[in-house]
Amino acid sequence: GNGHVKTFWSVGQHCICCAREAAARGLSNRMVLASLLHDASECYMSDVPTPFKNELPEYQEQEAYLLHLIYEKFLGSDLTAQEQAQLEEIDHAMLWYDLDGLLEKQDGEPPKLHIELDYTVESFAKVEAEYIRIFEKYSRSEK
């Protein structure tokens, strides 16, 4: 949304919802953690809107490399093709709802979700605490 949305919604909140959705789908602890971390590169490189990012191939390369390092550090390896497909399915479903709820009604049939979404504005401290709680829970079980 980058300022165009009805209310603030952080990348952290989006990632928390992705992790919760992965858990609700019964995916592995590794996939829950990957879902939480999938936008972690944006902490360092910023959240660039997709239409603009698509025009920045060098940016995409650097972002992919940074995400590779993050996955190596916290998951032990990059995602497999199957894991990447699962993550993209969750991320795209969540983005559909993010756009529908925060920007404008989306066309077509909504993707199936296994969690209830709540776009309540939360304090940074509360979001950070929940992100860390999920990270610690699933990174402990990943070792």
For each feature predicted by the language model, list its residue ranges.
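Metal-dependent phosphohydrolase cores
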Residues: 1-143
